[in-house]
Amino acid sequence: MRLGVNIDHIATLREARKTTEPDPIKGALIAIEAGADQITLHLREDRRHIQDEDLFRLKCELKDTNIPINLEMAPTYEMQNIALEALPNNVTLVPEKRQEITTEGGLDVVSMIDYLKDFIKPIKQQGITVSLFIDPDYEQIDASVEVGADAIEIHTGEYANAYGKNVEKELERIKKAAKYAKEKGLKVYAGHGLTYQNVSEIAKIKEIEELNIGHSIIANAVFLGLYEAVKKMKEIILNARKE
């Protein structure tokens, strides 16, 4: 199972003072040293953390490595143009609202089938893998296949926020969705709200081949250092996978 480390919140810390540190690109290199298989970053329309320059610097820094860049972005034509210029390995389309603190749910692919078909085509033509960040829902999975996505990233936020019996219920939804998506020929990834405490159960789901995790790793990096925080998360994931 691959671990994509999201560097957004290194940039959040930098933007809190509008300064040059901490540098998210330096963070990406440390994460890779510690075992990250991919670097994920979300270029939001409001540029609240990651800036355009970060994406292009990261691309330059990783050009001679085999570490892929996963660009999370809203399905807007401004973002499409940036993706077609930067040419990351992967693009993950996510919903976006300016007032939200973080992404609040999955992309409603069902309601934008025609739009997404046209939107995705030129991105895929450049050899970029396209993933859709969706809720664990059969209808959304079917729509993802219809629009031509290569992969889905299952939104694990409901699972992460669940308590008591609801934890098992949400986990079951994710398991069923992962199995269904795999049967439909999609690659299956997952992410959002995953922590050192709750990641194991998701990592055990054999259909899921990649997890993208950011906030929990960066939060723990404050106390452990980034290298150790990434290493610890990777160990938990790999150990869960062995079970």
Curated annotation (Swiss-Prot):
Q: Which UniProt keywords apply?
A: Cytoplasm, Pyridoxine biosynthesis, Transferase
Q: Where in the cell?
A: Cytoplasm
| InterPro entries the UniProt entry points to | Aldolase_TIM, PyrdxlP_synth_PdxJ, Pyridoxine-5'_phos_synth
Q: Which residues bind 3-amino-2-oxopropyl phosphate?
A: N6, R17, G193, G214, H215
Give the EC number(s) listed in the UniProt record. Answer: 2.6.99.2
Location (main, coarse): cytoplasm
Cite the active-site annotation.
H42 (proton acceptor), E72 (proton acceptor), H192 (proton donor)
Q: Which Gene Ontology molecular function entries are recorded, alphabetically?
A: pyridoxine 5'-phosphate synthase activity
- One family from Pfam that matches here is PdxJ
Q: Which reaction does it catalyse?
A: 3-amino-2-oxopropyl phosphate + 1-deoxy-D-xylulose 5-phosphate = pyridoxine 5'-phosphate + phosphate + 2 H2O + H(+)
Its cellular-component GO annotations read: cytosol
In the UniProt record, does the keyword Transmembrane helix occur? Answer: no
User: Which pathway or pathways does this protein act in?
Assistant: Cofactor biosynthesis; pyridoxine 5'-phosphate biosynthesis; pyridoxine 5'-phosphate from D-erythrose 4-phosphate: step 5/5
A GO BP term here is: pyridoxine biosynthetic process
Oligomeric state and partners?
Homooctamer; tetramer of dimers.
Q: What does this protein do?
A: Catalyzes the complicated ring closure reaction between the two acyclic compounds 1-deoxy-D-xylulose-5-phosphate (DXP) and 3-amino-2-oxopropyl phosphate (1-amino-acetone-3-phosphate or AAP) to form pyridoxine 5'-phosphate (PNP) and inorganic phosphate.
Record-stated family:
Belongs to the PNP synthase family.
Name of the protein in question: Pyridoxine 5'-phosphate synthase
Show the taxonomic lineage.
Answer: Bacteria, Pseudomonadati, Aquificota, Aquificia, Aquificales
Give the gene that encodes this protein: pdxJ
